[in-house]
Structures are given as structure tokens and as C-alpha cells.
Amino acid sequence: MMIIVMLLLSYLIGAFPSGFVIGKLFFKKDIRQFGSGNTGATNSFRVLGRPAGFLVTFLDIFKGFITVFFPLWLPVHADGPISTFFTNGLIVGLFAILGHVYPVYLKFQGGKAVATSAGVVLGVNPILLLILAIIFFIILKIFKYVSLASIVAAICCVIGSLIIQDYILLVVSFLVSIILIIRHRSNIARIFRGEEPKIKWM
């Protein structure tokens, strides 16, 4: 029972809509009505500006990061293969990612999982996250598309999990990559049409 409570708590924390709350609280804006209509960090930068964008990014990363440690902090006990699986920090973090993408507070219309996924990886393997961040910024520098850099980094996480033979990370990163591609499908279409906005600060 406590495992279910932990996973639900992880989902609810992940579902906290940082961009929406910051936009409403400090700018009196519903971020969903501007830019891409997304509640995540990238649209927060675009609509609310850099300070708010950095705050939303931090909060979204923190959501994923903190949930990874729930199995250590909460009174959950694994007494079999199924309970062991669901008390793995990566699996608990996955529920936070799902909450971010499909938040119950906003009728299941949330962000694209990039920052929250980064927080989960930070919690379980900081060195891997550093490598992925380097890849992300290299792709971003070359092509100027946040969406493309995010997808490439996610796919590299799948490859990295194979290299280090972390098969739970492989499952989670594969699922997250699929979610990322689905959530970025409109961005992908705009890239092919030459209509996707490029960043201007790199």
C-alpha cells in the first residue's frame, strides 16, 4: 500500500505545473495561451522571459530529482521482484515525469518532460546527465533547435544506458524518448517545413 502512495505522491509532485503557476502568479498570464501553448521550461523562457524561464527550469528539474529519493526517505519495503521494481528510484521518477507530461491539475495537458527527465537522471547518475547536457548544448549550438537537441539527448540516454548496462534506465529512457518524440511531433513537423523558431542566444 505504501508503495502505491509513494508512486501517487511522485506523480502529483511531477504534475505541479511550474510554468503555469509562475505565469499566473507573477505575470497574470496563462502560459498555455501564448507561444507553443506548452507549460514547460522552453515556452516559459519564450513567454515569461529569462528569469522566470530559469526558475521554471529549476523547479521542473527539482521535481524529478527529489522523487528519485522517495524509496530512501519513505517507509516502503520491497519483499519481492515486483515491489523491488516499483521501489527503484528510476521507476518512481518515471511517475514524476508522467505527472509533468499529463498533470491532473491542468486536465492532463502539461510539458514535454525534458527538464523533469533531466532531474531524474541527475538523481541516479549525475555523470551521465553531464554527458547528455554536453550533447544537448552541442546540438543546440549547431542547429539552434531546442526540440531537436532534447530528442537527440534522450536517444543518447538510451544508448548510454546500454553502454553502462543499466537495464531499468534503458526501459525508462526508452519510454521517455517515445514520450518526447510524441510531445515534440509538431516541432518535428515545423523543422521539416523550416518554420520551427531557432534560439538566438547561442
Curated annotation (Swiss-Prot):
Q: What is its main location?
A: membrane
Asked whether the UniProt record includes Lyase among its keywords, one would answer no
Catalytic activity, reaction form: an acyl phosphate + sn-glycerol 3-phosphate = a 1-acyl-sn-glycero-3-phosphate + phosphate
Any GO molecular function: acyl-phosphate glycerol-3-phosphate acyltransferase activity
One Pfam family name is G3P_acyltransf
Keyword Lipid metabolism recorded: yes
Q: What does this protein do?
A: Catalyzes the transfer of an acyl group from acyl-phosphate (acyl-PO(4)) to glycerol-3-phosphate (G3P) to form lysophosphatidic acid (LPA). This enzyme utilizes acyl-phosphate as fatty acyl donor, but not acyl-CoA or acyl-ACP.
Supply the name of the protein.
Glycerol-3-phosphate acyltransferase
